[in-house]
Amino acid sequence: MSEVQILLLLLLSGYLISVSLGMVIIPRILVISHKKRLYDVPDSRKVHTTPVPRLGGLSFFPVVLMSFALVIGFRLYLWPSDLSSFSIEMLHEYLFLFVGMTLLYLVGFCDDLVGVGYRYKFIVQVVSALLLVLSGNWLDTLGGLFGIYSVPALLGVPVTVFAVVYVTNAINLIDGIDGLASGLCCIALSVLSVFFLDRKSVV
């Protein structure tokens, strides 16, 4: 198989694994929400008129993590001689990234259950963004946009932290309308998938 075919297969596998796990896990989480009466009560920012279970999002991060691990595992197991899109040197990037994602996930979970003050959420968001920077992923180039190819760290790091915190809060704000946040995220991730495929990168 060519590298493009392998990447397409892995992307499709990741999608199918995520959907399958979500279909198995989410209904069981909703049962718990109903039993414990953990509901999202309607207010002026939300479109639903009756209380709905709040823990549906609890499955998202574990599903993403398991899908990612399985896809990378299959990649290393089935095609060990062709690892141009993955190397052990990238491991520290994933570790920092997953720690930051875990922090955001835990704060979101606690916020759903008991509520978390905006100051604490902001601090965790900044820490998570800094962990992303520590993984080596920060805005260091605009790819020629406006004639800019290189962005210094003194500018790129703060802009990256601001962007992560901004997008995190933006998604949280629009999450009150059913399907809006997930739809926008699906569109964004689809575009990113095309870019990754064009660069022959599995992640």
Listing of model-derived features with the role each one plays in the protein:
Residues 2-203:
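"…together with the soluble PPM/PP2C metallo-phosphatase catalytic core" -> "…together
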